[in-house]
C-alpha cells in the first residue's frame, strides 16, 4: 500500500507561501516518479538548523538543507535509487537569503533548488563536487527545477 503524506512546518521564521510550496513539492515528487512518500519539510532559521547540524553532523554552523532518511530498509530501491521516501528535510530560509545573493538568484528559486537537492539525497543520489556541468545529481536537480519552477 502506498502512502502520500507531506507535512510542512515553519520554525522561528515567517513564511506566507506554504500552499505554493506544498504544490511545488508534490509536483517535484511526481516528476521524480515518487508516489509513495512520508515527507516532512521544516523551514527554519539559522539557529534551529545549526543545532541540528551540530547534533547530527558535528558541524557547529548553519547550512542550507539537512536531509534525514528514515527508510532504513530501502524499500522501493531500484538500481541504487529509492522511489519510496520516508524522511525529513530541514531548510534554513535565513541561510538561503545569503546563498541566493551569492548565486545571484531569487530566494524562492534557491528554496526550490535546495528542496529538490534534499529530495534527491533522500532518494539516494549523491555528488562528489558542486560542478553543475558534470555531476549527474546536480544536472538532474536543475532539470527538475526547470520543469517545476513556481512563482511565489
UniProtKB/Swiss-Prot annotation:
Q: Which domain of life is it from?
A: Bacteria
Which SUPFAM superfamilies does the record associate with it? Answer: Metalloproteases ('zincins'), catalytic domain
Which cofactors, if any, are listed as required?
Answer: Zn(2+)
> In Gene Ontology terms, what is one molecular function of this protein?
zinc ion binding
> What does the Swiss-Prot or TrEMBL cofactor note state?
Binds 1 zinc ion.
Q: In the record, which residues are listed under signal peptide? A: none
One GO BP: rRNA processing
Q: Which GO terms describe its cellular component?
A: cytoplasm
Positions binding Zn(2+) in this chain are 117, 121, 127
Q: What is its EC number?
A: 3.1.-.-
Which NCBIfam families does the protein's record reference?
Answer: rRNA maturation RNase YbeY
Tell me the protein family, please.
Answer: Belongs to the endoribonuclease YbeY family.
**HAMAP family recorded:** Endoribonucl_YbeY (MF_00009)
Instruction: Give the function comment from the record.
Output: Single strand-specific metallo-endoribonuclease involved in late-stage 70S ribosome quality control and in maturation of the 3' terminus of the 16S rRNA.
* Protein name in UniProt: Endoribonuclease YbeY
Species of the source: Borrelia garinii subsp. bavariensis (strain ATCC BAA-2496 / DSM 23469 / PBi)
User: According to the entry, what is the taxonomic lineage of the organism?
Assistant: Bacteria, Pseudomonadati, Spirochaetota, Spirochaetia, Spirochaetales
Q: Which gene encodes it?
A: ybeY
